[in-house]
């Protein structure tokens, strides 16, 4: 509940074989796993689902029927309520990509949101993105986007990645209205 795992795989050997019209009997693929771990999250945060799908799933794990589940709901958006005190986290499917965002309740402290990485070296790029470098490739988190909905209008809030302490990252913000929720869309 406190981390994301990203798997990077180098498919260049397969691409080369395809280009050369060769069949590889035992292709060797190299992968790297990058872990993004959020620090200090609420271990008792309540899972929630939004935008329910019209279908459900059934899971049959082994022959022990006590481990089976049927009619499990599917959702277009899921998340945790109070992931941090006063902050909810959501994941959604956005055009075949998974996105996550935070909703900070009025008066809550977005500085609680902090994370570190294992398996990659992180660098904040001068243009505001966060670059994760591995031996086989990079992941680029574009500059974060933050806003507030006030009187039916979306008001932009300046937001940037910041290195809170060595290897620990978070967000910094420009001025915003503490009386309204703040949405952070990394």
Where are the predicted features?
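Residues that cap or anchor secondary-structure elements
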Residues: 1-186
């Amino acid at each position: 509940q406190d981390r994301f795992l990203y798997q990077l795989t180098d498919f260049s050997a397969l691409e080369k074989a395809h280009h050369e019209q060769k069949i590889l009997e035992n292709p060797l693929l190299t992968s790297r796993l990058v872990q993004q771990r959020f620090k200090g999250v609420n271990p008792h945060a309540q899972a929630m689902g939004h935008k329910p799908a019209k279908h459900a799933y059934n899971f049959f794990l082994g022959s022990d029927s006590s481990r089976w589940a049927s009619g499990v709901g599917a959702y277009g958006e899921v998340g945790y309520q109070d992931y941090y005190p006063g902050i909810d986290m959501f994941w959604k499917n956005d055009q075949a990509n998974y996105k996550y965002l935070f909703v900070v309740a009025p008066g809550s402290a977005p500085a609680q949101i902090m994370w570190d990485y294992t398996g990659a070296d992180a660098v904040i790029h001068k243009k505001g993105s966060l670059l994760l470098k591995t031996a086989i490739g990079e992941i680029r988190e574009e500059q974060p986007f933050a806003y507030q909905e006030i009187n039916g209008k979306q008001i932009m809030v300046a937001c940037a990645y910041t290195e809170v302490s060595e290897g620990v990252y978070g967000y910094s913000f420009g001025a915003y209205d503490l009386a309204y929720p703040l949405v952070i869309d990394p």
